[in-house]
Amino acid sequence: MEYKIFYSWQSDLPHRSNRSFIREAIDEAVSSISKDGVVEDSPRVDEGMDGVAGTPEVATIMFQKIDSSAIFIGDVSLVGSTEPFDENRVKKRTPNPNVLLEMGYAAARIGWNRIICVMNERFGERQEQPFDVRNRRFPINYRLEPGKDPNRDTVKTRLAGDIKGAIEVMALSEHQRVATIRTKLDSRCLNLMNQFASQPSFPSPNTSTAGQVLASIPIDAAIMRLLDLGVIRADVNTQIGLYAYHWTYLGDLVLRGLAMRK
């Protein structure tokens, strides 16, 4: 089964030591695990597009890519610092704000347990990370000079191994979660899952008539349980007043485990 990895990069630091280097390590890690992994870079707006009307579409594409990803990998190398508002406070270091935005969205949509943080400590230590990053997802670290570094290949091999290990731990955790979820599915959930397993999403039940309201009761109960279990997620189109439920990556694993989806 194909799984997608969303790579959130930044360009504040040299590509050779960060963006392209981390991408090479991710590709190496994925290829050593499976041929089914697909790595997608975060879309970024070119400098000449800043402020134009089409800019929001990049954010839409970015969020959609994160929603469909199994794993989020972000470069949280420290790129800047805050200016204290009085002399009694010290400067605080910070990663790229776009990476933090994407990571926060990923945490809400696919969960902290599927987020991998990576940082080049040549530009700052892990202990300098913002509190949430430091305590929730302590970053995988490496140290590489921005110019020609004789240890580049050695550092990349070690980083690829660390990323591979993190992905494998996530895979084991997902397998255990799928097994646990399967024990919590009642007949209403199984009927709904079997009905819509072949579709990427399904609509909220129609309740225009009294009969439809009664018929929707077991469906609504199944939907609530599947939402609680993280098997589906809800999206709403406010323009047409339509609710739709989409299978999550975890939901896809559950469907495959039940032989409802190939």
Regions found by a protein language model. Give the residues of each.
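Short glycine-/polar-rich loops that comprise or flank the Walker A/P-loop
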Residues: Y3, S69-A70, I110-I115, V133-R137
